[in-house]
Structure formats: C-alpha cells, structure tokens
Design a protein with these regions (language model features):
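N-terminal Rossmann NAD(P)H-binding glycine-rich loop of SDR-like oxidoreductase domains
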Residues: 3-23
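NAD(P)H-binding glycine-rich loop region in Rossmannoid oxidoreductase-like domains
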Residues: 44-81, 92
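Glycine-rich NAD(P)-binding loop of the Rossmann-fold in SDR/ketoreductase-type enzymes
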Residues: 45, 77-85, 107, 152-153, ...
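Conserved Rossmann-fold NAD(P)-dependent oxidoreductase catalytic core, especially the SDR/UDP-sugar
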Residues: 88-144
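Conserved beta-loop-beta element that borders a ligand/cofactor-binding pocket
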Residues: 105, 148, 158-183
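Alpha-helical substrate-binding/gating segment
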Residues: 166, 176-184, 196-218, 225
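Conserved C-terminal active-site "lid" loop/helix of NAD(P)H-dependent oxidoreductases
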Residues: 218-243
C-alpha cells in the first residue's frame, strides 16, 4: 500500500512513518525539509502545488496542523493550516481516488467534558472515591464540546471527513488523539495519566487505522491502555481490532 503522511517531519509523523515503512511504501509532505526518502516540501494551503503528490496513493494520514491550543491563539494562525490546508488535503485525496483517509483530530474536541465531574477530578489527579472501572466514559457519539479555537478547527476537520465519506465515498477515520510527547514520557500534568499515548501504541494504532478493512466513517479516541480514562478508548480499540501494550500507570512515580 502507498501511504502519504502530511506533517511527516514531526514526532507523531516520524513514529508512524517508521512503523509503517516496514510493510508499506511511505511518502510525505512537510512544510520544511525532512531527512527521509519520498518526502516533498510543500505548502498545504496551495492545492495546485500539492495535488500531484496524491496520485497513486492508497491512504492518506493527515497530521499537519497548527498544534498550539492556548486560549489566546488567533484565527490568523489556525485557519490557514487547520482549515484551508485540511480542506485541500481532503479535496486532493478525493480527486486522486484515495480510498482511506485518516485525520488527526484531538481529544480537545470533547475537552469541555473535563469541566464536569467525575472527569474534572480525574483530569486533575483527584481519584478519592472513584473506581476507574465504574467511571462513565465520553463516547464518540456524544455532542462535541470543543475547549478552544484549536479544538473547534479540529471539529471542522471531522465534519469534512463525514462529508467526504457520506457524499464522496471515501473511507474516513478521525482520530481524537491523546498526548504524544517527544520524549515518550508523561510529564508532570496529572491529565497525562489519562491521555498518554505511547509511541509504540501510537504506531500500531495508526497502522490499524490504515489497514482495517470495512470502515466507512469512524471517530475514534487514541490513547494507551491507561488505568484512568475519560474518553471511550476501549470501544475504539474494538472497532480497529487494536490491542494497546502500554499503561501510563506503570510510569507513575
């Protein structure tokens, strides 16, 4: 299978490309030069420039984004990369006959559920009186509750995926990603024990997103098999036939 990865030069792109390259042909697009064969430098907001790279591609993994999600980030930074570029990538993929499209969304699309208990307590690391096996989970079919402008742009990317699936016949999986650290560590934020996605699990999860047959449209949550959960990752694992290997709890000091 020939797979095109946008944003291939980042941590997530590199981890996924390294894993998939053992069994697929990998190409990529990045805004900056990347020391990897098959990678082209291009601006995703220029659809005429990027369209030729999609010819003959079987699956697209769209990772490229403005990833800052601070409350004060402006639309001037978010709209070109997270909206215009994303629409261009969907459109170029469809025009080239790409079968499978995997869109990197974010847990932040549902992030305002973390303002409510019991999820607020779990995100803050306050576990007293809570049973991890009894906490209700935020599912993919619950209404989106974006926690900022960044999250709102990711929600739009999911809506584009639904359109291209329902109206254009493309197979689309939107991955509401947890936390992927450059160092593969959890860090000091207690929310990391909910959202941590190990590099090993990340790679195999995206492999399943690309390879699992019979999917028309799905929104899935991506994280490791962490003890404390807010989002319904187990249902996503079942949809993809994926078994995670890691658990953030094993790294708790």
């Amino acid at each position: 299978m020939k797979i095109l990865i946008t944003g291939i030069g980042g941590t997530i792109g590199s981890v996924i490309a390294d894993a998939l390259s053992t069994r697929h042909e990998i190409t990529g697009i990045d805004i900056r030069p990347v020391n990897r064969a098959g990678v082209s430098v291009a601006d995703l907001t220029d659809i005429d420039a990027i369209s030729p790279f999609f010819e003959g591609v079987d699956a697209v993994v769209h990772l490229a984004a403005e990833r800052r999600h601070t409350p004060d980030i402006g639309w001037d930074l978010l709209l070109p990369t997270n909206v215009i570029a994303t629409a261009n990538v969907y459109d170029a993929a469809h025009a080239a006959g790409v079968r499978r499209f995997v869109f990197a969304s974010s847990m932040h699309v549902a992030g305002n559920y973390e303002s409510d208990d019991p999820w607020a307590s779990i995100a803050a690391g306050r576990y007293d009186g809570l049973d991890p096996d009894s906490v209700p989970l935020v599912t993919a079919d619950m209404p989106a509750r974006p926690d900022g402008r960044y999250a709102a742009t990711k929600q739009l990317g999911e809506s584009l995926g639904r359109y291209y699936s329902d109206c254009e016949g493309m197979e689309v999986i939107c991955v509401r990603l947890g936390t992927v650290a450059d160092s593969d560590s959890i860090g000091d934020d207690p929310r990391g024990y909910v959202s941590w996605f190990s590099h090993r699990d990340l790679a195999e999860f995206f492999a399943a997103c690309v390879e699992k047959p019979g999917i028309r449209f799905e929104i899935v949550y991506g994280a490791s098999a962490n003890k404390w959960k807010i989002y319904d990752t187990p249902s996503s694992w079942k949809v993809l036939g994926f078994t995670p290997s890691d658990n953030a709890e094993h790294h708790r000091g």
